[in-house]
């Protein structure tokens, strides 16, 4: 039976585990820079300049990691 892969969770978990700096663009154009500390189905906790912020996912437009994220190796580890 083929497993479904959740790209969003895989991507965010990799950013969190590898402590990769990320720029988050919100739908209103505002930018947040920092590190993903935690996430769930609706929110993300980002550590930005020593302060933690809880951001709702529906307010996020784009994530831009500081370095490339390989999702293929993560998918292989899950299988």
Curated annotation (Swiss-Prot):
Stretches assigned to coiled coil: none
Entry keyword set: RNA-binding, Stress response
GO BP of this protein: regulation of DNA-templated transcription; regulation of RNA stability; regulation of translation, ncRNA-mediated
GO cellular component: cytosol
Domain of life (superkingdom): Bacteria
Gene Ontology molecular functions: RNA binding
All copies of domain Sm, residue ranges: 9-69
PANTHER family: RNA-BINDING PROTEIN HFQ
Reported function: RNA chaperone that binds small regulatory RNA (sRNAs) and mRNAs to facilitate mRNA translational regulation in response to envelope stress, environmental stress and changes in metabolite concentrations. Also binds with high specificity to tRNAs.
Summary of subunit composition and partner proteins: Homohexamer.
Family: Belongs to the Hfq family.
Protein's name according to its UniProt entry: RNA-binding protein Hfq
Species this protein is from: Brevibacillus brevis (strain 47 / JCM 6285 / NBRC 100599)
Lineage, uppermost ranks: Bacteria, Bacillati, Bacillota, Bacilli, Bacillales
């Amino acid at each position: 039976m083929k497993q479904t892969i959740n790209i969003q969770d895989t991507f965010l978990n990799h950013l969190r585990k590898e402590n990769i700096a990320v720029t988050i663009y919100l739908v209103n154009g505002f930018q947040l820079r920092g590190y993903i500390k935690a996430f769930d189905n609706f929110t993300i906790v980002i550590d930005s300049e020593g302060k933690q912020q809880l951001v709702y996912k529906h307010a996020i437009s784009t994530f831009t990691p500081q370095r490339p994220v390989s999702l293929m190796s993560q998918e292989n580890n899950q299988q």
